[in-house]
């Protein structure tokens, strides 16, 4: 009898087979949330840029009412804009990282996660260049890009020339429109996400009644 059933299955076209449900666990990013800082500030300000929405997102992901059993790690990377001096910016980004660390302690989950990484990256010239390259309204954009690329080994000179370019027109624009995007901490929530993939089962013969979809 069993052999007859197997033979019947093998005789079905490929589209007639019931798909076998499978379960996989994938290490993946659940959410990436960005907290922005005002110029020279280190405290988390809910009124700064999109912080209100970011905090709501963190509440939904990390609060005690959330399903947090799959969350395995938190990665926090903090940055500053390049308008300050080198030593000042190093101190500033460390303080911002510490501020985020204190802010996250409101969530009980954070105290239970085994892997929490905090990293102070400092001046984010790579993102700065991307923002400059994509901003068609930036005065002297090509000259700004040339200065960024040419003076990679002399950051102090690069900053000095950016301030002086065209009597500071480009720099004043960047202070208003580019630098605020760089003053941030990026919080990446990592977890094991369970995925169950069930294809639709459409019976094509009487033997399909043997399966449970």
Segments predicted by a language model, with ranges:
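Bacterial Sec-dependent N-terminal signal peptides
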Residues: 1-22
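Short loop/turn segments at secondary-structure transitions that flank enzyme active sites
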Residues: 43, 82, 124, 193-195
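Periplasmic OmpA-like peptidoglycan-binding domain that tethers envelope proteins to the cell wall
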Residues: 81-187
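Amphipathic alpha-helical repeat scaffolds of TPR domains
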Residues: 206-213
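Short, charged low-complexity linker/loop segments at the C-terminal edge of domains
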Residues: 192-204
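Residue-level recognition of well-ordered beta-strand positions that form the cores
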Residues: 77, 188-190
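Periplasmic peptidoglycan-binding/anchoring modules of Gram-negative envelope and division proteins
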Residues: 21-30, 37, 41-77, 105
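Extracytoplasmic
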Residues: 30-32, 69-71, 113, 182-184
């Amino acid at each position: 009898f069993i052999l007859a059933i197997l033979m019947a299955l093998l005789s079905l076209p490929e589209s007639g087979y019931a798909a076998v449900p499978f379960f996989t666990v994938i290490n993946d990013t659940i959410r990436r949330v960005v907290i922005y800082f005002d110029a020279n500030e280190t405290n988390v300000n809910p009124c700064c840029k999109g912080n209100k929405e970011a905090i709501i997102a963190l509440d939904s992901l990390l609060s005690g009412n959330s399903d947090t059993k799959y969350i395995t790690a938190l990665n926090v990377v903090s940055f500053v804009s390049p308008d300050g001096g080198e030593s000042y910016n190093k101190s500033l980004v460390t303080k911002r990282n510490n501020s985020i660390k204190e802010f996250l302690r409101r969530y009980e989950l954070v105290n239970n996660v085994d892997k929490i990484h905090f990293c102070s990256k400092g001046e984010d010239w790579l993102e700065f260049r991307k923002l400059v390259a994509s901003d068609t309204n930036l005065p002297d954009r090509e000259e700004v890009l040339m200065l960024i690329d040419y003076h990679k080994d002399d950051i102090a000179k690069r900053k000095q020339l950016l301030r002086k370019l065209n009597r500071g027109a480009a720099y004043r624009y960047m202070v208003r429109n580019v630098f605020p995007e760089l003053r941030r901490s990026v919080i990446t929530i990592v977890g094991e996400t369970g995925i169950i993939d069930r294809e639709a089962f459409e019976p094509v013969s009487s033997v399909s009644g043997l399966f449970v979809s």
